[in-house]
Amino acid sequence: VCGTSSQTLDYTLELFIRALENQKPKVVILETDAIYREVPSQKAIFTRLANHLAVFRYHNRWKTLSWNDFLGETHFTWTDDWKGYRYYATISGTNPGEYMKPVETAAEIPERNIRYVKEIQRLCQENGARLVFLSAPSPVNWNYARHNGIQALAQEMGCEYLDLNLK
């Protein structure tokens, strides 16, 4: 499992490339909400640069370096608030019919995001993995038009698609 809250596809691709260095998954499940999450041009460029030049990823780290960082024992003290979870015990159900009313239209997927998804699929194929699209239940972020958009993309790419928002 490799995911973070509000993850964009540029970061998904970066994490997937890193995972493939040590792992050989048989199935890769891509949560579809990210496919509709806009990746701003500036962020896409920065992510690509950070993959190739560590100075962009760790550009402020030099300010806090000490000799102990080079010579001492490694202490992993940094945490990323986007990774992990927040325990939340409240349960509030919903009626799927309220937000998943069938429509004929399909929500448009940003072209840049389609390119990211196709790159993920290419890496899956090269590494013997099957790409599966999954829409987790989400009455706030999901609707039938988005379902139709992902369904069309899945058919075009030959991917399996599971939408848990449907009855």
What is the predicted function of each stretch?
Residues 6-10, 109-111, 139-146:
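Acidic-and-aromatic substrate-binding clefts and catalytic sites of carbohydrate-active enzymes
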Residues 1-59:
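Membrane-embedded segments
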Residues 2-4, 31-33, 134-137, 164-167:
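Active-site-proximal beta-strand/loop segments in catalytic clefts of secreted hydrolases
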Residues 19, 123-124, 153:
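Hydrophobic helix-cap positions at the C-terminus of alpha-helices
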Residues 24-27, 125-132, 157-160:
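Loop/turn elements at helix/coil->beta-strand transitions in domains of secreted/extracellular proteins
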Residues 148-149, 155-167:
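C-terminal regions of proteins
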Residues 32, 38-130:
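Secreted/periplasmic serine-hydrolase-like ester/acetyl group-modifying domain
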Residues 13-19, 119, 146-149:
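A short acidic, amphipathic alpha-helical/loop segment
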